[in-house]
């Protein structure tokens, strides 16, 4: 039986706008039955979200989004792991430490571009959670360096030059292994972002399947109908589960993305 679900969302525990409980309340208002909280490199908001889900009648799945080393746009979602997740926590601790070190170099990078903002203000924007690009973008907007969050990314935070500010990332195989070690399922997120021709994406999907990938995010707000059809074909070809997610961060962070939801069959997620 299918349920209306959104399996890719972010809260203020990483770079989203809403506290986990507030995110779940919005999901209930949007008519969602199942929500996965997939913050970047952290599960710190999960238990708050689960408690809110019981209050609002939304089933909340534990989740996480991990960036893989092979490509800056290769992201792996971990879904449906249990209340104990030592392998993922160990990996995420390493990833967060690398993010924490990189924030100093981001400030230096922006200063070289004439953007002078304080790290203290960025950390306040982050609310003590994982510091990520949207936090820098919000501060830049506040001080008038950009006219919109989109401009902050286009001019500064999503350029090839910015991407040379390195941080540690695990390989896709390591991400999948950590997710499996804690009883979860590994899903390729927003494949369109990889920007690969179909043949290359087919080869990458085959390699990821060989590493244990369980599913592919076929449904995503920025996928075209043609892309969605191709991803569904990849799922059939490689016996991958089909998921869908909005990648919702909040109206202030990604104004064009709302909590959506797709009719999905989720019996394969063991911790439902």
What are these regions (language model features)?
Residues 97-124:
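Conserved phosphoryl-transfer catalytic core
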Residues 89-98, 123-126, 162-163:
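Flexible, glycine/proline-enriched loop segments at strand-loop-helix junctions
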Residues 126-193:
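Conserved acidic, metal-coordinating active-site core of Asp-based
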Residues 33-35:
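Short active-site oxyanion
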Residues 1-11, 17-30, 44-66, 70-84, ...:
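Charged catalytic cores and adjacent phosphate/nucleic-acid-binding surfaces used
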Residues 82, 93-104, 130:
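Short, amphipathic alpha-helical segments
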């Amino acid at each position: 039986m299918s349920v209306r679900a959104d399996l890719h969302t972010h809260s203020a525990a990483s770079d989203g706008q809403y506290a986990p409980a507030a995110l779940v309340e919005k999901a209930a208002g949007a008519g969602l039955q199942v929500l996965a909280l997939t913050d970047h490199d952290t599960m710190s908001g999960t238990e708050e979200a689960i408690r809110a889900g019981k209050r609002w009648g939304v089933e909340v799945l534990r989740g996480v989004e991990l960036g893989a080393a092979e490509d800056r746009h290769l992201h792996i979602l971990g879904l449906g792991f249990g209340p104990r997740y030592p392998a993922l926590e160990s990996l995420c601790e390493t990833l967060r430490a690398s993010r924490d070190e990189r924030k100093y170099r981001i400030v230096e990078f922006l200063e070289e571009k004439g953007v002078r903002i304080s790290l203290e203000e960025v950390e306040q924007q982050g609310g003590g959670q994982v510091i990520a690009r949207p936090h820098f973008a919000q501060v830049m907007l506040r001080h008038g360096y950009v006219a919109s969050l989109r401009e902050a990314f286009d001019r500064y935070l999503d350029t090839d030059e910015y991407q040379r500010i390195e941080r540690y990332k695990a390989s896709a195989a390591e991400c999948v292994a950590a997710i499996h070690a804690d009883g979860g399922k590994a899903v390729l997120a927003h494949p369109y972002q990889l920007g690969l021709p179909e043949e290359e994406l087919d080869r990458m999907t085959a390699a990821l399947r060989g590493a244990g990938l369980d599913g592919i995010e076929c449904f995503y707000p920025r996928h075209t109908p043609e892309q969605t059809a191709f991803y569904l074909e990849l799922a059939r070809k490689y016996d991958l589960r089909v998921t869908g997610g909005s990648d919702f961060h909040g109206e202030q962070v990604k104004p064009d993305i709302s909590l959506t939801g797709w009719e999905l069959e989720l019996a394969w997620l063991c911790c439902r």
